C-alpha cells in the first residue's frame, strides 16, 4: 500500500482498519511535490497541506483552496499530510473509526470484516461519509487530477474521482497513484469554503461548504457552484441552488432562498459527530453564510478572503 504523509493511514492501521503487509513510501518523490501557478494551478500530490495553505499564489488567486487546506486537522498534521492524501482520505463512520476491540464487540460492519451497514441495516451499500476538506473546493473550481499507473496515465475531473459507496469511494484503480491536481485559472471568480466541526482544530468535517460565483459588472451572478462535503459518501453538488442564483444578485433574500434549495441534497445519517437532524439544518445555514461572504457580508468567525478580479 502506498503512503505519503500517513496522517490518516497510520491511526487506521493502529485500529486494524487497514492491515497492509507492505507500505511503499512516496515522500522522496520530489517531482510530485511542487506547486506552480502559470495560468492554471498545478499541485503536486505530495505538496503538504501547509505548503498549499501558505503558498502566496494559491492564497492570492485560489483563496478557497488555501483556506480548505488550512482548516484540515492541526498544524503538526498539516505539516505532514499531503494535498493528494486529503483528496483520497478514507470515508468515516462512528461504527468504523473505533478500536478493533470495540468493533469486534458489536459484530463489525460491512466496511471492515462484517456484512451489514450498522447505520442503515437494510442498505446494500456502506454509508460512511466523505471526510475530505479540499475535494468540495476542487469540484467547485472544476479541478482535475492526474492518475498514473505502470502502463497508463489519465486525467479526470475531481468530481469523477468519487462514487456513491463508503467502501469503494474512489474511482481510482488499485494500481493508480494520484500525482497532480490541476485547477483552472479562476480570476474573476469569488470563492470560499466553510467547515463545521465540534472543535476549532483537529476534527474532520461534519459539514463542508464550498461556493464559487462569477459576477457580472452589475453584480448579477453569471455562474455559480455549490458543493457540500461531509453529508454523503462523496461530495454533493447543489446544482439546483447554483442554477437558481444565475441572473440574480447576492442579496439577503436571494441567499436565503438559494440556501433553502442547496441543503436538500444533503443526506447526513447518524454516523458522525453531533446529531444528523442538526447537521442537515446547519447545511442550510452554512450555505447562506458562504454565499453571504461572497456577497460581501461580514464573516466574524473567519478571516476575510480577498479575490483577484
Language-model region placement:
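C-terminal structural segment of proteins
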Residues: 1-309
Amino acid at each position: 500500500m502506498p503512503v505519503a504523509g500517513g496522517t490518516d493511514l497510520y491511526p487506521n492501521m493502529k485500529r486494524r482498519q487497514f492491515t497492509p503487509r507492505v507500505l511503499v513510501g512516496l515522500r522522496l518523490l520530489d517531482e510530485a511535490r511542487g506547486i506552480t501557478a502559470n495560468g492554471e494551478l498545478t499541485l503536486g500530490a505530495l505538496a503538504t497541506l501547509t505548503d498549499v495553505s501558505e503558498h502566496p499564489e494559491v492564497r492570492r488567486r485560489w483563496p478557497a483552496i488555501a483556506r480548505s487546506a488550512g482548516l484540515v486537522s492541526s498544524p503538526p498534521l498539516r505539516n505532514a499530510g499531503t494535498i493528494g492524501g486529503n483528496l483520497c482520505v478514507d470515508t468515516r463512520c462512528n461504527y468504523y473509526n473505533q478500536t478493533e476491540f470495540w468493533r469486534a464487540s458489536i459484530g463489525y460492519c460491512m466496511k471492515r470484516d462484517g456484512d451489514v451497514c450498522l447505520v442503515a441495516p437494510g442498505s446494500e451499500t456502506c454509508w460512511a461519509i466523505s471526510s475530505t476538506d479540499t475535494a468540495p473546493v476542487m469540484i467547485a473550481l472544476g479541478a482535475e487530477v492526474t492518475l498514473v499507473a505502470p502502463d497508463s496515465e489519465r486525467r479526470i475531473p475531481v468530481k469523477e474521482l468519487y462514487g456513491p459507496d463508503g467502501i469503494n469511494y474512489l474511482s481510482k484503480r488499485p494500481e493508480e497513484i494520484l500525482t497532480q491536481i490541476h485547477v483552472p485559472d479562476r480570476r474573476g471568480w469569488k470563492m470560499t469554503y466553510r467547515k463545521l466541526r465540534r472543535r476549532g482544530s483537529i476534527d474532520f468535517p461534519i459539514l463542508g461548504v464550498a461556493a464559487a460565483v462569477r459576477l457580472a459588472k452589475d453584480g448579477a451572478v453569471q455562474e455559480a457552484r455549490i458543493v457540500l462535503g461531509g453529508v454523503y459518501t462523496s461530495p454533493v453538488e447543489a446544482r439546483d441552488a447554483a442554477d437558481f442564483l444565475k441572473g440574480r444578485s447576492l442579496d439577503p433574500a436571494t441567499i436565503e432562498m438559494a440556501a433553502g434549495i442547496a441543503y436538500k441534497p444533503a443526506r447526513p445519517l447518524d454516523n458522525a459527530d453531533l446529531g444528523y437532524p442538526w447537521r442537515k439544518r446547519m447545511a442550510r445555514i452554512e450555505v447562506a453564510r458562504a454565499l453571504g461572504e461572497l456577497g460581501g457580508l461580514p464573516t466574524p468567525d473567519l478571516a476575510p478572503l480577498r479575490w483577484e478580479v
